[in-house]
Amino acid sequence: MANSPQAKKRARQNERRFAINKARRSRIRTHLRTVEEAIASGDQAAATAALKAAQPEMMRGVTKGVMHKNTAARKMSRLSSRVKALGA
């Protein structure tokens, strides 16, 4: 257990950051799930709209340190290619 005042403060800050990051990760996953569902339904218009909504959310996660930038880029690339394939 944390003994020094500094360690106690860091523990409090870690709890707070964990809650914020957890909410942010959850919001990103929700957006990704809506894109996946739109792709599964075969509706390109809905999938494109969901992808446009998910992209800034993922980039915000990268900026805030919740997700690595290469992971976000890979997910966006794969999703956009799948959405594009719906129209072909």
UniProtKB/Swiss-Prot annotation:
GO terms for molecular function: small ribosomal subunit rRNA binding; structural constituent of ribosome. GO terms for cellular component: small ribosomal subunit. Keywords: Ribonucleoprotein, Ribosomal protein, RNA-binding, rRNA-binding. GO terms for biological process: translation. Residues 1-25, 61-88 are annotated as: Disordered. It comes from the Bacteria. InterPro entries: Ribosomal_bS20 (IPR002583), Ribosomal_bS20_sf (IPR036510). Binds directly to 16S ribosomal RNA. PANTHER family: 30S RIBOSOMAL PROTEIN S20, SMALL RIBOSOMAL SUBUNIT PROTEIN BS20C. Belongs to the bacterial ribosomal protein bS20 family. HAMAP family: Ribosomal_bS20. This is Small ribosomal subunit protein bS20. It comes from Jannaschia sp. (strain CCS1). The gene is rpsT.
